[in-house]
Amino acid sequence: MNIDNDLLSKNKEAKVVSENSTVEINDVTNSDSKNTDNDFQTEELNNFEKIFLNLNSDLLNQQLLVKNNLKLYKIRAEKEINRAYKFSLKSFISSLFPVIDSMEYALNLFKKDDKILCLIFNELDNVSQSLMNLLVKFGVTSIKDINIAFNPDIHQAITTQVSKDIKNNYVISIMQKGYLLYDRLLRPAMVIVSKNDI
């Protein structure tokens, strides 16, 4: 029986040692597993942080883009409003040109030696000047200069005239004034252009 007890005792010791080894192995395995889990979690956190930073950067870039687009839109809208304001009177002003032309033509026909006609002339001249001052107030300028180079953007040549005194391709005479509304041509000036004798 002693042998059996010894065997039994050794068996129990082996079992205890075996259990302790298993516990130690399990502890080491659990420790390694916990370290692996911690490393994995840290890596995941780092990945999430990178993703978050990228998304944040993208959102900031989009915010700047939207701000810039709004600024550009505001600038364009202001330009359109200014342009619409400047040129809103274009058709009205253009319809006044025949009246102005008729008044100027009538003023050129007057003989200045008759007193009554002279009074009428002065009144018509005042009306004409008042009308032109009003147009200038709204940004209209007349094209009436002579002895300047012919410019097809603002002049329309009716005919040419041979001249030795004036340079070739210069405006000799204005037959009908032209008009600009700010920088936009409303009507070209009808002109006679010089031509050198060849």
UniProtKB/Swiss-Prot annotation:
Which CDD domains does the UniProt record give? GrpE (cd00446)
Please report the name of this protein according to its UniProt entry: Protein GrpE 1
Q: Give the primary localization class.
A: cytoplasm
Which residue ranges traverse the bilayer?
A: none
Task: Please name the GO terms that the record assigns under molecular function.
Answer: adenyl-nucleotide exchange factor activity; protein homodimerization activity; protein-folding chaperone binding; unfolded protein binding
Localization in the cell: Cytoplasm
Q: Any idea which UniProt keywords this protein has?
A: Chaperone, Cytoplasm, Stress response
Q: Which residues form the signal peptide?
A: none
- One Pfam family recorded for the sequence: GrpE
Q: Which InterPro entries match?
A: GrpE, GrpE_coiled_coil, GrpE_head
- What does this protein do, in the record's words? Participates actively in the response to hyperosmotic and heat shock by preventing the aggregation of stress-denatured proteins, in association with DnaK and GrpE. It is the nucleotide exchange factor for DnaK and may function as a thermosensor. Unfolded proteins bind initially to DnaJ; upon interaction with the DnaJ-bound protein, DnaK hydrolyzes its bound ATP, resulting in the formation of a stable complex. GrpE releases ADP from DnaK; ATP binding to DnaK triggers the release of the substrate protein, thus completing the reaction cycle.
